Amino acid sequence: MSGQHQITEQPSGNPLSRTSTLIQEKPLTPTSSHAETQKHLEAPRQSSFLIQLQDIRHAIRMPMAEFFGVALLIIFGAGSACQVVLSTNPNVASSDRGSFLSINLGWAIGIAMGAWVSGGISGGHINPAITIAMATYRGFPWRRVPSYIFAQVLGGVVGAALVYANYIHAIDIFEGGRHVRTQATASLFATYALPYMTQVSCFFSEFLATAVLSMMVLALTDNRNGAPTNGLLPFALFVLFIGLGASLGMETAYALNPARDFGPRLFLAMSGYGKALFNYRSQYWLWAPIIAPVLGAQAGGLLYDTFLYDGDNSPIKWRRASSQECQLAEVV
């Protein structure tokens, strides 16, 4: 019809033609109301700086747990030693404030509190000797060992610094002046052996006590051997340390832990106690509270895994295959 224009939809051989029409009808740019809704639904974007901080926190979380665990250990342990010994001076306190049992309880409480703080995050080693033993016998990654040990020693330094700052005036009175520092107060933070102890006896005492500690730690974390729940493990360690202090603690002040001795000793060296800290008994600081505990922990782990442990994650494997495993092996 010439006077009318009739619009008819012609089929197109191009399959994209309909698509292009739909695209024109529904543009990609959302309406303003739709865009506002999307903004509310989108999660807030974090700045790159905050993301970096979160990454750093995640990377150092386990070592920091070890740091705080050892710091608490020193605060309770060295703090109790300071209170007991310094109070024997009548110019510091009117009466004695405690006994060896008080010091023993202080260290036991310190190990329990340190384990509670760090146990669920880093495993609660708070001891380089235990960290190395766990890497040897329980598959703890060796790549994490250096960061753990560094954090543990640093925790010992900071813990000793806090206790020293708290008792500095009492230490001044006890020593006779601000610039007088002797073994009498150094022994409140670092370990020293009794005068009659020979070098071999000192080494053996620390070796034996740490071997017992290591064996008990492996037993307390062995699910096949009636291990306590995670919440009760620190209490078990508390009881263990009371026993170790009461039985093996007198002669060398039972370091059992390189970070417990070396960390505070480093702080004392920075606080004016001099070279005597490291010259005492031909480098006693190295072979008694560091080497002996490390070797003792290895010996304790070796004994436990050789004669008692029945798990699969030890280099010493004694577990017999079950009947099902034997049948599977025969089929294969």
Curated annotation (Swiss-Prot):
Q: Which PROSITE patterns match?
A: MIP
Instruction: Please indicate the ranges of residues that lie on the Extracellular side.
Output: 88-100, 166-199, 252-283
Keywords, A to Z, come to:
Membrane, Repeat, Transmembrane, Transmembrane helix, Transport
Catalytic activity annotated for this protein?
A: H2O(in) = H2O(out)
Quote one Gene Ontology molecular function term: glycerol channel activity
Question: For this UniProt entry, what is the primary localization, expressed as one broad class?
Answer: membrane
Explain what induces or represses this protein's expression. Answer: Expression is up-regulated during development of the basidiocarp. Expression is positively correlated with root abscisic acid (ABA) content during ectomycorrhizal interaction with poplar trees.
Membrane topology, from the record? Multi-pass membrane protein
InterPro entries with a match to the protein in the record: Aquaporin-like (IPR023271), MIP (IPR000425), MIP/Aquaporin (IPR050363), MIP_CS (IPR022357)
**Stretches in topological domain Cytoplasmic:** 1-66, 122-144, 221-230, 305-332
Please give the name of this protein: Aquaporin-7-1
Its source organism is: Laccaria bicolor (Bicoloured deceiver)
| Gene transcribed to yield this protein | AQP7-1
